[in-house]
Regions:
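Conserved SAM-binding motif I beta-strand of class I
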Residues: 74-79
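S-adenosyl-L-methionine
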Residues: 1-49, 87-120
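Conserved short alpha-helix immediately C-terminal to the canonical SAM/SAH-binding motif I
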Residues: 84
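Conserved class I S-adenosyl-L-methionine
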Residues: 50-59
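C-terminal substrate-binding/active-site "lid" region of AdoMet-derived donor-dependent transferases
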Residues: 135-194
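Glycine-rich SAM-binding Motif I of class I
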Residues: 61-65
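A short SAM/SAH-binding and catalytic strip from SAM-dependent methyltransferases
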Residues: 122-135
Length: 199
């Protein structure tokens, strides 16, 4: 199923790509993960209904709705752009209405990703190269702090990862690479890399 058909089926609108760039060089432009790549990822690494997934730089919420639709997991999206945040909320209304589903397992937060308070139940964290390395490092520090307070296994999913993200995670003392899923053939970066905590 192509992106427009997926969006139509879920009664959401996530396809449009941001034109131009964010006013801060720390934050990158919005571009949703292709649905066919999500299908490939989760065929190899399926989720459970009991999982809690946080998408940093969620945009209009494509990943959130896809995961909820397929796995019924709890999903949280963090977005700094007000327009995208309100589009995600509109998508949530349409999605819930069309599928007669309750909304309590889908959440969106407006604000800086590095200010998001990681909760004890959060166990998957998704990044599509949404911001600069210093912000990514701060978020990983927040996740590690949460693990120190509430020990558990967590997974970091990187899509189209930058060399800086990869180097940082490959050399992090508290995470190990769990696997890779290659998708598409545009570039060698066209992949997902999954890291798991050693806790």
């Amino acid at each position: 199923m192509n992106a427009l058909n997926y969006d139509k089926s879920l009664h959401i609108e996530t396809e449009e790509i941001q034109v131009g760039f964010h006013k801060s060089y720390h934050y990158h432009r919005y571009e949703p993960t292709p649905y066919e790549h999500l299908e490939q990822l989760f065929r190899e690494f399926p989720l459970r209904e009991t999982d809690y997934v946080v998408d940093f730089g969620c945009g209009k919420g494509r990943l959130n709705f896809y995961i909820h639709y397929v796995f019924q997991s709890t999903v949280k999206g963090v977005e700094i752009n007000e327009d995208f945040y309100y589009q995600a909320l509109l998508n949530l209304e349409q999605y819930a209405k069309s599928r007669k589903k309750k909304k309590e397992k889908i959440h969106f937060y407006l604000g800086r990703a590095e200010d998001f308070l990681v909760q004890p139940e959060d166990n998957y964290f998704y990044f599509f190269n949404p911001f600069s390395l210093p912000i990514f490092q701060k978020i990983i520090s927040n996740i590690v702090y949460s693990l120190e307070q509430n020990s558990r296994k967590v997974n970091i999913i990187l899509y189209f990862p930058s060399d800086e993200y990869r180097f940082f995670m490959d050399n992090h003392a508290l995470f190990k690479k769990k696997g890779e899923v290659k998708v598409g053939n545009r570039t060698e970066k066209d992949m997902f890399i999954i890291y798991q905590s050693l806790y």
